[in-house]
């Protein structure tokens, strides 16, 4: 018979009666690269039909359920240096993650970290295989380690995670924390991409042709002042 892996049982329990979310969660990570490539097809199509304004509410609804928060290096480092569980789930989070859904900040056993190949970097030019997509917390990292060998998933230390982020920043990449209703509505995935090879940045660029206020990414909350 079929033997369900422990990490699969974990996400099944997490979603309870919402089998639809369990299936979405499972497919999203187990078929990470095909999922991202399919998203890219949709983005390229939307880029050509920005005249179709009735799509704006649908795009906004999607972004309210799947979005990212840009992180400055110092904030990313704080996450990777956590030595105890962190739970911040109140509506006050919306001040820094300004979306209706998926704004919980939850890290259970944050020292348990995995990394795998970034699906965006493999789907977009120059089609690089870069091991820089990071999962923080036992639940999500265990799932990656049990299901994502084909994407070179491996366990890493907190120090190694900081090193990956720092190396990516030095080459002009932007770090984001991702939130998705279908994966529990909380952060856990942190990745670094350039705007030209990141699905979320490309989605924002395409959908801002519909409405300039549409964005899948929330800003870091910091601004730069230049003394003259």
Which sequence ranges carry the predicted segments?
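Disulfide-bonded cysteines in secreted/extracellular proteins and peptides
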Residues: 118-120, 132-133, 191-193, 198
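Compact structured core domains
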Residues: 146-182, 188-197
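N-terminal, charged low-complexity regulatory/assembly segments
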Residues: 3-132, 162-171
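Activation/maturation switch segments at domain boundaries
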Residues: 172-174, 196-219
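Cysteine-centered iron-sulfur cluster-binding motifs in ferredoxin-type domains/subunits
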Residues: 190-201, 223-228
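Extended, non-transmembrane interaction/recognition domains
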Residues: 133-140, 177
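Glycine-rich, charged/polar anion/phosphate-binding loops
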Residues: 99-101, 174-180, 205
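Ferredoxin-like iron-sulfur electron-transfer modules
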Residues: 178-185, 209-228
